């Protein structure tokens, strides 16, 4: 995963604009998009 300067986490396999956010190879990763915290289970 790539950690952004604002603390956001971007991982390979992330799909924006859909209902599903998939993190490939990052079992414990959390994605922060704006005010949303999305874990791998969403």
Curated annotation (Swiss-Prot):
Organism: Plantago lanceolata
Keyword Cytoplasm attached: yes
A single MF term (Gene Ontology): actin binding
Function of the protein: Binds to actin and affects the structure of the cytoskeleton. At high concentrations, profilin prevents the polymerization of actin, whereas it enhances it at low concentrations.
Designated name of the protein: Profilin
Family, as annotated: Belongs to the profilin family.
Keywords, ordered alphabetically: Actin-binding, Allergen, Cytoplasm, Cytoskeleton
Highest rank taxon of the organism: Eukaryota
One cellular component term from this protein's GO annotations in UniProt: cytoskeleton
Keyword Cytoplasm on entry: yes
Subcellular location: Cytoplasm, Cytoskeleton
Assembly mode: Occurs in many kinds of cells as a complex with monomeric actin in a 1:1 ratio.
